[in-house]
């Protein structure tokens, strides 16, 4: 279990079994009647273990994990939004009179935008519009996490609201007809809180060279597995379409995959999965960073590789459609790079399984290219492409919408298309 030391107690986070009644009673605590079936079930628990004040902490644990469903129809909704930096997440809670199934059943809300860098002090109110609902793995029961986007009181999206523009792209009839699928590989790095140095690294020093750590097992090679596993289970409970996890090449770095997701859902699921990860690392006393190159030198950076396909790409003859998409992406390389995350120039150097930020390239099974096509896709003549350029701190609404726009809605001039095809050795 991941542990964070706090005054007079330790906090553990993870998926744990309920404490037996006898053990709880022996500790001086009370066993709450919690339903174990249906939507009210939560396998994700916050557990506080006392070193000095056992009775007090046991009661705290019970309150944190208490399922209120048998006692009230009211639920807690955690409203979540993207903050002023465009990468930070904010949230606050409110009571809703009864369980809800759709975001349209939830009220709009507001917050102080001057405290998040999203509005001036003299006109600070920013309005939250509920857009997607997920089950709350921290509170359990019928409680929910709510992904919101942000608007002025007049109903205009504020500059950091990238979801609004993405929703417009994904509602375009041409895009809808192509049913765009996204599979996003979110990499992240765990840091020791007081020193901001990767988990498992000696303070002020370095571990052995890369090689033994990717998908590794063992206490000398894998650092943070408890956090990765707790996050995996919490995402499954929440209803996020998480499809896998693995330890990464750099020690202390991990990856999880979300998808395939259709359209705007991809962005919603990545943002909520990031929120859940932030909450878990908060409880574990570990710092989460999405910096694309947290450690300079001969160490891998952190990306957010985005696998993408359209209906036409997935059908027979789809490889030709993929090649046309690659051609379009090459012609808008600079636009995509500018939208693919802050600090990406430190990562896209042409080393450590990346392409150069300055040059567009593509290849089959080549992880040193901007766009990779899998051998399976080449062999079958249909499938998907992988855009390896996005940084770990990218906005998934921006990246997914831009991929759809460039490959479905945007048409280059014939002259530009011919020149690009010749340069990339693409026959389209």
Curated annotation (Swiss-Prot):
Please list the residue ranges annotated as the GS beta-grasp domain: 75-155
A single GO BP term for this record reads: glutamine biosynthetic process
SMART domains of this UniProt entry?
A: Gln-synt_C (SM01230)
One GO term in the molecular function aspect is: mRNA binding
Q: What class of enzyme is it?
A: ligase
Task: Give the main location.
Answer: plastid
Its keywords, alphabetically, are: ATP-binding, Chloroplast, Ligase, Nucleotide-binding, Plastid, Transit peptide
Name the InterPro entries for this protein.
Answer: Gln_synt_N, Gln_synt_N_sf, Gln_synth/guanido_kin_cat_dom, Gln_synth_cat_dom, Gln_synth_gly_rich_site, Gln_synth_N_conserv_site, Glutamine_Synthetase
> Could you tell me what this protein does?
Light-modulated chloroplastic glutamine synthetase, encoded by a nuclear gene and expressed primarily in leaves, and which is responsible for the reassimilation of the ammonia generated by photorespiration.
| Miscellaneous | Plants overexpressing GLN2 show enhanced photorespiration capacity.
Family named by the database record: Belongs to the glutamine synthetase family.
Protein name as annotated: Glutamine synthetase, chloroplastic
């Amino acid at each position: 279990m991941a542990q964070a030391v706090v005054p007079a107690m330790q906090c553990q986070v993870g998926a744990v079994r309920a404490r037996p009644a006898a053990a709880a009673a022996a500790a001086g605590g009370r066993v709450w009647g919690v339903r174990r079936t249906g939507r009210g079930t939560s396998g994700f628990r916050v557990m506080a273990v006392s070193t000095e004040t056992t009775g007090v902490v046991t009661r705290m644990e019970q309150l944190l994990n208490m399922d209120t469903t048998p006692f009230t129809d009211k639920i807690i909704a955690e409203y979540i939004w993207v903050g002023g930096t465009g990468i930070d997440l904010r949230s606050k809670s409110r009571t809703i009179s009864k369980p809800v199934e759709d975001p349209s059943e939830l009220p709009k809300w507001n917050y102080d935008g001057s405290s998040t860098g999203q509005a001036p002090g003299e006109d600070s109110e920013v309005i939250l519009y509920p857009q997607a609902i997920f089950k709350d793995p921290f509170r359990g029961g019928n409680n929910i996490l709510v992904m919101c986007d942000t608007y002025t009181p007049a109903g205009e999206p504020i500059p950091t609201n990238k979801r609004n523009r993405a929703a417009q792209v994904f509602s375009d009839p041409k895009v809808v007809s192509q049913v765009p699928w996204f599979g996003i590989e979110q990499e992240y790095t765990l840091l020791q809180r007081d020193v901001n140095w990767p988990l498992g690294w000696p303070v002020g020093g370095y571990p052995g060279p890369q090689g033994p750590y990717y998908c590794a097992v063992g206490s000398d090679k894998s650092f943070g597995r408890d956090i990765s596993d707790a996050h995996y289970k919490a995402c499954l409970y929440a209803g996020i379409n998480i499809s896998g996890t693995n330890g990464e090449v750099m020690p202390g770095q991990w990856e999880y995959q979300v998808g395939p997701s259709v359209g705007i859902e991809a962005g919603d699921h990545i943002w909520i999965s990031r929120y859940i990860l932030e909450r878990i690392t908060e409880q574990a006393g570990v710092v989460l960073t999405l910096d694309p190159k947290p450690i300079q030198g001969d160490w891998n950076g952190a990306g957010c590789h985005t696998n993408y396909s359209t209906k036409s790409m997935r059908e027979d003859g789809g490889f030709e459609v993929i090649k046309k998409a690659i051609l379009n992406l090459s012609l808008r390389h600079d636009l995509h790079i500018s939208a693919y995350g802050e600090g990406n120039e430190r990562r896209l150097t042409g080393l450590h399984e990346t392409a150069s930020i300055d040059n567009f390239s593509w290849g089959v099974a080549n992880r040193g290219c901007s766009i990779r096509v899998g051998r399976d896709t080449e062999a079958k003549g249909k499938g998907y492409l992988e855009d390896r350029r996005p940084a770990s701190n990218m906005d998934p609404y921006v990246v997914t919408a831009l991929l759809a726009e460039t490959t479905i809605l945007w048409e280059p001039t014939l002259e530009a298309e011919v020149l690009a095809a010749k340069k990339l050795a693409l026959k389209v």
